[in-house]
């Protein structure tokens, strides 16, 4: 949470995204700005050249009782005021904690074989993808012993985050540092330039937010109390599907 909100503070210093090595001001991928129309300040968010009125949320939002020009609103940034220096300090402090914690967790996954044993999908898992998608759409969750294991969509989602989004987030964050670019010149080359890295960093962050939101929804849908108890204590109660009642035999003797 601190990484996201402090990152939005940093983004607000220049609320636009580009692709390549340099900022192409006339061709932004994304731009949040404020424009004056009929004497009033309006927020306009432009995505691939298509403008949208986002007054009150993006581009222009209420700050200390009046509409002010800023990318994301103050309630979504740390600190609330426009303070790039403080935002960078918060971001870099928690970035180190994130990187160290992530490295230790990845080492644990390898040593404990959690990655291969629990998260890596088998051939049978991959063949079950269509049925798993259908079950999720219907909010139908596994019962019995199957409920204690990750289904194939969970496995793929965790692998995309753990082996894709999170490493890419770290690499793109490092690429935005001129000092690290000098030490590791392969970084901006691999990611298509520093502005591309900034765009990738932004997209990865919101992809992880989306993953988290879906994850929380699934916890509620699958049974909040049982799921949270298993997360906190490791105790998961397995419920078995009840057998349908047998039809009465009307011809049987009393």
Region annotations inferred by a language model:
Residues 1-254:
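Membrane-embedded alpha-helical bundles that constitute the cytochrome b-like, heme-associated redox core
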